[in-house]
Structures are given as C-alpha cells and as structure tokens.
C-alpha cells in the first residue's frame, strides 16, 4: 500500500512539470509564432466613426503541407484533451481597416466553411441581421479578402472564414418587446412588494412590546392586531429582515440537527461546481495567454476539475437519502395503502417539489432571455449571450418540463441539465420509496433502474459526439 502511495505522489510531482506539444518540453517561443486564438480590433474606436462597421469572424486556417508553421499548428491541435484548436481562431475586424486591401480580394480563391452545423447554428442564433443580408454579403467578400491578405502576408497561410455577426454604428439598439417589458414589470412588482412588506414588518415591530431583533425571529400569528388586517404572516413574507433571520437561524428539530453534516457536503460541492464553471468560462472567452490554461491541464490536480461532473453525484445521493428519510418518517404510505392513494401521494409530493423549483427557474429563463444581453457591449458579448437570448425565448419548454439533460441541442441555460436529471431521479426515488415494503424484489428492481438510468446518461455523454447545440464549447 505504501509503495502505491509513493508511486502516486511521484506521478503527481512529475505531472507538475509536464508541458509539451505532444512530446518534449514546452517551447513558448515556438508557441508564440502561431496565430493567436483571438485578435480583436478596437471595438469602441471602430464604432466611434459614423460609417464604422465591426464584424466578429470565425476563421479556419487551411492546411499547407509545405509550411513548417502549419505542421506545428496541426501538431498542437491534435492534442484535443489539453490544447485549443489553433487552426480555428476568431478575429474581430473593423471594416474601415480592411478597405485598403479591397483590391487584393481577387488574388485569393474564396474558400467556404465546410462545417454546415456551425453555419446552421449561427443562422439560428444571430437573427437580428436577417434584414441586412445584402449588406452582409458585401462584408463577407471584404472580410475574406482582408483576412487572407493578412494571414498570407504574416504567416504565408490561407484561410476560410465565416462572419458570425456584424455591428454598424448606424444600427439601432435592440428594441424592447413584450417579454422584456414583462420581465421589467415583474422586477418592479417584486421590488415594490418587498419594500411594502419590509416596512409593514418594521411597523409591527415598533407597535410590539418586543423591540429587539428577536421580534423578527418569531413567527407572526394571523390575527387582527394593532388595527392591521389579518394575514400578517402572508403580508410580511417578503420582509428582507425577517427572511434574513429565517435564513441564518439554527436548526431546532432533532432530524435537522442529525443531517446538518450535509451542509458541509453542500458547501464543498457548490465550491467545486462554481470553480469548475469559472474555469470553463475563462476557456471560452478571449484570453491573452491561452498557453497557461493548456499547461494547467497537464497538472495532476486538474483531473479533479476535468471529472467535476462526478461531484454532482453527491447532490443526487443527498436528494435521494433525504427523500427516503422524510417519506418514511411521515409514513404517508403504509403496507395496506391502496394503489389510487399511492398515486395521489406520488403526484402530491412531486407537484410540491416541481412548483417549488419552477419560480426560480422561470426567473433565470426570463433574465437570460431579456436582460442578460443588455448588461454589456463589446466585440465578443453577442457571441457569449445571443444564444441564451434566442433559445430561452424559443426553447424554454425544455427547462420548464425538466428535460434539458436529454435535449441539450439549442437549449437555454445548459447548466440547468442538473435540475432535469435531479427531477427525473427524484421521480424514480419516489417510486422506489412507495414500492411494497414486503416485496424487496420491486424495491431492488426500481433502484437498479435508477442506477442504470444515471449510468446510461453519463456514458452517453462520454461516448456520443457533441451536437451543434454545444458547438459554442467546441470553439
């Protein structure tokens, strides 16, 4: 056992120093000779000109057997587990800078992007420019000639390109529609109710004999008091101070204290999830030193983040355990309970969980479909947020019915796949909890189906290729 531990530690130490293309040591000088992954012209300066137009372009570098630089690019790109695709790059092009090279367009053969899925994906996402098809057709030829001229002059390589979208200084801002107004209206209503509820709670405290902060920790009774209408618990349900105390109050029941250790697992799990998603986002946005992330993937501890999806299993296990304990404790199903009553209990418990999660999920969908795209503006912002705006408006039903994990293509908020998987496993766990306690065969069969379901989804995601819906992460 000690020898295996020594081998593991030695492997970890050796892995810290790993950093190469496919073999040998990492050479930063050779690395910097390759075309950078992202090169963006000054966005604000370009659009400061009234006639300025800025285009974000996806570029594929064409093979060139006689070029040593191309062989280096191809060698690096083959290591897909640790390296970016350096033969696929993004360029932010200010067309005013390209016009001097417009006479050179005829010198280059106009290559077309072969990835039809990518073209279809961009067509579905960037619908704002449908009315400018003639204008974009001219931009297409101009951008291709400009980029080919630059790559040929600097790297002796040729390219084919695809305009993702173009923005002109004369383009009007995105107009507000009914969905935008609905979201803003909901925000205003929630803010107004919160202020009124907090003020009412403050007034009740002033009228009460208990003036300390303990007033907010005690539940109010629904009675006519101090000349106020009944239903005080409902009217103060949006009180900021009262909800804060409810959030941080200690556990009182024995069961809550017994399972309080789950909070530690939750904190560790949430920390790992947030850290993993943060690293994922940094790998999909323009960065100055992509070699840092590539070298980071060679390190031993990186395997923790690469297998971060396994951390999610902690939440599945906790969810199933708490469901079983609560279900057994309340004894809603007895050995003599009839089938119809079991079905009624199933739908009652499922509906309670469904409608408890739905408001927060709808709020996320509305935010991504309306406000998210307006928070910032820049050369890469639409690339990151436009898909969310479009798909959250058209494919919201995948999230509402919790089937996102089965239908990731063109889905809204990919990260909500967990809610879909958790809800489906919750249904299976609920069925297993209602299985006849006298018939262990039924219980074990249901649990086996749950395990097979989880394993099947994991293996399908591991072996099947990504579709166009997640093409964003492939780039």
Regions found by a protein language model. Give the residues of each.
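Intrinsically disordered, low-complexity regions enriched in proline, serine, glycine
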Residues: 66-67, 102-106, 283-284, 325-327, ...
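Short amphipathic alpha-helices and their capping/turn residues within compact interaction modules
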Residues: 98, 283, 323-328, 332, ...
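Intrinsically disordered, low-complexity regulatory tails flanking kinase catalytic domains
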Residues: 379-393, 453-456
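Extracytosolic (periplasmic/ER-lumenal) interhelical loops and adjacent juxtamembrane/interface segments
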Residues: 241, 292-301, 387-410
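Generic hydrophobic alpha-helical segments
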Residues: 11, 62, 100, 327, ...
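Hydrophobic alpha-helical cores of multi-pass transmembrane domains in eukaryotic membrane proteins
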Residues: 188-192, 264-278, 307-322, 354-371, ...
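Aromatic-enriched alpha-helical transmembrane segments of multi-pass intramembrane proteins
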Residues: 331, 342-345, 394-420, 427-475
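Exoplasmic/lumenal regions adjacent to the first transmembrane segment
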Residues: 2-264, 269, 276-312, 316, ...
């Amino acid at each position: 056992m000690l020898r295996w531990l020594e081998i593991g530690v030695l492997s970890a130490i050796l892995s810290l120093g790993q950093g190469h293309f496919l073999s040998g040591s990492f050479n930063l000088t050779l690395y910097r000779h390759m075309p950078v992954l992202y090169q963006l012209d000054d966005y604000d300066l370009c659009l400061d000109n009234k006639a300025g137009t800025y285009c974000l372009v996806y570029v594929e570098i064409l093979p060139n057997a006689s070029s040593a630089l191309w062989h280096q690019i191809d060698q690096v790109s083959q290591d897909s587990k640790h390296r970016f695709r350096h033969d696929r790059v993004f360029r932010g092009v200010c067309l005013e800078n390209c016009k001097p090279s417009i006479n050179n367009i005829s010198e280059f053969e106009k290559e077309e992007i072969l990835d039809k899925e990518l073209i279809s994906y961009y067509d579905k996402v960037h619908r704002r420019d449908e009315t400018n098809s003639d204008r974009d057709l001219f931009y297409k030829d101009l951008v291709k000639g400009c980029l080919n001229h630059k790559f040929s002059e600097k790297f002796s390589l040729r390219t084919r390109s695809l305009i993702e979208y173009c923005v002109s200084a004369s383009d009007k801002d995105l107009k507000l529609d009914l969905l935008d107004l609905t979201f803003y209206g909901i925000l205003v209503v929630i803010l107004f109710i919160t202020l009124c509820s907090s003020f009412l709670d403050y007034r009740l405290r002033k009228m009460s004999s208990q003036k300390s902060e303990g007033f907010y920790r005690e539940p109010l009774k629904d009675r006519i008091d101090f000349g106020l209408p009944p239903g005080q618990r409902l009217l103060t349900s949006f009180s900021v101070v009262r909800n804060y105390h409810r959030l941080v109050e200690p556990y009182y029941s024995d069961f809550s204290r017994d399972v309080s250790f789950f909070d530690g697992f939750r904190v560790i799990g949430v920390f790992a999830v947030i850290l993993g998603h943060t690293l994922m986002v940094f790998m999909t946005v323009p960065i100055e030193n992509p070699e840092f992330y590539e070298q980071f993937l060679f390190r031993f501890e990186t395997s923790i983040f690469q297998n971060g999806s396994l951390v999610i299993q902690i939440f599945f296990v906790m969810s199933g355990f708490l469901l079983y304990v609560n279900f057994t404790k309340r004894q809603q199903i007895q050995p003599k309970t009839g089938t119809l009553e079991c079905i009624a209990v199933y739908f009652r418990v499922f509906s309670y969980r469904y409608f408890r999660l739905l408001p927060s999920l709808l709020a996320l969908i509305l935010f991504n479909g309306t406000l998210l795209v307006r928070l910032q503006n820049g050369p890469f912002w639409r690339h990151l947020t436009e898909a969310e705006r479009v798909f959250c408006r058209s494919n919201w039903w995948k999230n509402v019915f919790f089937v996102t994990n089965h239908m990731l293509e063109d889905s809204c908020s990919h990260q909500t796949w967990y809610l879909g998987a958790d809800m489906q496993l919750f249904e299976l766990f609920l069925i297993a909890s209602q299985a006849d306690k006298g018939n262990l065969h039924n219980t074990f069969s249901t649990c086996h189906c749950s395990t097979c379901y989880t394993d099947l989804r994991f293996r399908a995601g591991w072996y099947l290729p990504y579709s166009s819906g997640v093409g964003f992460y492939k780039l």
